């Protein structure tokens, strides 16, 4: 299966070992006018080596050909991908399989979350009326089966961008009716009417919205307009509006949370009826972003995987390099009863060297 997802990486190629992490210290201030909502003051460039399990492979042979073809399609249609904008460490793994995650409504966000590499501004450029057609054309040309479409926050628009998101998805469905669509949506500023207008009769398989971090860290990590409780409300309402859809969310770790807080956050998420969850390591994208507090070992991600399954999540991806849209099509298949997503270091997967073992019901080293 071929899928399509959105995030950005620094530079054209990524080395086998990912970039080092800088030691930074939070400063003061606020966000919303094109600058980061809270500045981070550098106290030095202590270059930490990432743990040994942080390795990924560059594409070769057929994978290199697919990577180049995906790059060409994105550029040809003037599209944005999360793969690039969010500096995703899996870009070569995904693009090497002919997949990408599309980011719509521009490449400038009205929020200033302290973990995110996407540019921010109070008044982003106006929406591109040709974007629905361009997006549909790119997805048709790439011949994918499961498309992930993510969005930037557009608090500058009365409906939060919902009508534009809908136009983009409908254009893709009309051009490629056989393609399964997953939307990774904003919180629409908590506007449930906008959420309803977006979701009613929308031809999608999965509605995803990320809680991002454990509740205690909201004020430290996310824009002041976002919160764990608001995100849960959006996910819960989405399920009420469209009980036929799979709902999905993601948690980043390494931001200062404890292991038990991750488990408790998963319990709260599952209590709202969320079907699918991903957990991955936070990596600092730049000098003005929150520094990494810790690197949980792969065995800890395996424990979270097991606990999430015991809670009743129908699909789980938990590993250091997992991101919310990683191998999304396979994760959707898992949620409908297929085998769990298998990720092995020997395949060049960017997840880790965790593999799923049916004998003990979870991921093992």
What residue ranges belong to the model's regions?
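Conserved alpha-helical substructure of the radical SAM core
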Residues: 120-147
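Structural beta-sheet core signal
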Residues: 149, 183, 249-251
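Cysteine-centered iron-sulfur cluster-binding motifs in ferredoxin-type domains/subunits
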Residues: 103-116
